């Protein structure tokens, strides 16, 4: 793997991480519990250490993960009370976080995404 690709990958992961950390801060200020914010942080830390080549690699570690369409994966956390929805580029090892929030917020997100498409 080339230096440029590593640097670019690192930048994407860090920026994604910053978005998650900002969202965690928002959750902490809202009516969500600190336990839920901790779950987001834990998931993010685990993903930084993973190398996924396909959806089967994800399911080896996250049995309840769902493949919504090619490259789109939904993770359930906190006993399915919340969702992390990502786009995975398996060939280059990138994970783009598209949504973090409650199940109700996720339904609204999907409606908005369909309107835009």
Spans of model-derived segments:
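Basic, Lys/Arg-enriched alpha-helical interface segments
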Residues: 1-81, 89-96, 103-117
């Amino acid at each position: 793997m080339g230096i440029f690709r590593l640097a670019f990958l690192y930048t994407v992961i860090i920026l994604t991480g910053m978005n998650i950390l900002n969202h965690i801060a928002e959750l902490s200020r809202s009516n969500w519990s600190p336990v839920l914010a901790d779950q987001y942080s834990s998931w993010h830390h685990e993903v930084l250490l993973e190398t996924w080549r396909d959806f089967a690699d994800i399911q080896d570690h996250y049995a309840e993960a769902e493949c919504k369409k090619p490259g789109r994966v939904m993770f359930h956390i906190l006993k399915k009370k919340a969702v992390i929805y990502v786009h995975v580029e398996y060939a280059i090892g990138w994970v783009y976080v598209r949504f973090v929030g409650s199940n109700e917020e996720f339904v609204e997100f999907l409606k908005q995404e369909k309107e835009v498409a």
